[in-house]
Amino acid sequence: MPPSRLAREAGRQAFGADPANYHDARPDYPDWVFGTLRSRCALGAGTTTFEIGAGTGKATRRLLDLGARPLVAVEPDPRLAEFLRMANLDPALTVQVSAFEDAALDAGAFDLGVSATAFHWLDEEAALAKIARLLCPGGWWAAFWNVFGDDSRPDPFHLATRDLLQGSANPSTGERGIPFGLDREARLAALKRTGAFDIVDTATSVWSLVLDEDRTAALYATYSTVSLRPDRDSVLAGLRRIARDEFGGRVVRNMTTSLYIARRAA
């Protein structure tokens, strides 16, 4: 029997209990992602931008630094939204505490829309239809993910913790045995089905994240499938023990970063 799935509404409130730990423990996005936004998606000075599910701002700060202004960040969790505001005291940034479905954004007003490791929490078809309405002709949409895991490489820590972590899945798991952010065929097909984009493209990179036992526990504490468990503390203690006793305090997680971009047709 496949694992149960966290409801979208529950998942959207799963990350705000400790925003500072989330911001510190989650890895940054590779530089090539933002380089692509600059070279392909016209990110630069004065790019009118919206960001879906901005969280604590792991991508927001980079967007602001590269010229996204004004930038409207949409974040449904008020705790994450407050952290985002306080960490980015930039007059170009506006934070809307709202689900994207309900966000008040002007149609045709944006040069760029972005979502970083958050788009799987939305209904893809409905969200893409709204995104297309918000972008001006020639505007760009970009969704990217840092995905934990890569089946093409050995992953001993994942195998060692599989029984401990059994439980609910979340939408990032995907529907076809492929993580949502890595299901190239499905994501590109959804973009094309809108009929709103004249260019769609994707790129990926693989890399490694090296963690000690404390950083391992801190990272897993940010996973919705861990943070919402009633036995969260014992699971984190178990992860810490495995990292220390079976891996000598050095855990290597396989990472894949994926990026999907699409240009709004005239």
PLM regions with names:
Residues 103-113:
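A short acidic, Gly/Pro-enriched loop at the edge of an enzyme's catalytic core
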Residues 1-44:
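Conserved class I S-adenosyl-L-methionine
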Residues 117:
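Short catalytic micro-motifs in class I SAM-dependent methyltransferases
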Residues 56, 179-266:
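Conserved Class I S-adenosyl-L-methionine
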Residues 122-131:
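A short, conserved alpha-helix within the catalytic core of class I
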Residues 132, 136-206:
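Conserved catalytic/acceptor-binding region of the Class I
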Residues 50, 56-103:
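Class I SAM-dependent methyltransferase SAM/SAH-binding core
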